[in-house]
Amino acid sequence: GLKRKAHEAEVREQRTKALYEIARELAGALTLEQVSELARRFVGEQLGADALLVPADEYAHLQPAASLPAGNVDLLLLRMAADSGQTVRRDELSGDGDASLYLPLRASLRTRGILAVAFPAGTPAPADDGLALLEALASLIAIALERLHYVDVAQSSELKIVSERLRSSILSALSHDLRTPLTALVGLADSLFLVKPP
């Protein structure tokens, strides 16, 4: 009784600490690959499972998924999780190596992808606290992916502004270079028009 409760409290404390740590690491991630690697490492360390991050593009289409080293991803369940925005479980959560849990990465505006989790063959189904941990991780990943999206949007906007300034400068320089000779030619034409023929 008491030892079990003490052990459960210790596990909860370790997982809370791990969540704070992964949140900090995800906040510093600069690429999708870094986010994916952090997710895999966290799921492996905390639950002994394998994870695959399947991001969605800007049109909310899932990008082609690689396979999990431990097993396969069910594309139908992946699509169901993306379409419904809800966690989808295969009938049997106990490990057989194939992905059996699909968590949507819901951000403030839309779903940013799916986290597919595969439990190793022969492992029991995760307890409720393990599922809650995965849902918290999915929320953190969604926030990180949304932040990366907005960084890309800001960089793209900045690039457009710089290219527009460059285009404007080039056109201004060209127009000045063309204006000077044209002004001289117009002046000469006016002079010739004003001169009476002999």
Model-assigned labels for residue ranges:
Residues 1, 195-198:
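Short, intrinsically disordered, charge-balanced linker/junction segments flanking boundaries
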Residues 1-25, 144-150, 160-161, 166:
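Signal-transmission linkers at sensory-effector interfaces
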Residues 21-156, 183-193:
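GAF sensory domains
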Residues 129-132, 165-169, 198:
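Long cytosolic heptad-repeat coiled-coil signaling/dimerization helices
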Residues 168, 172-176:
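Conserved phosphoacceptor histidine of two-component systems
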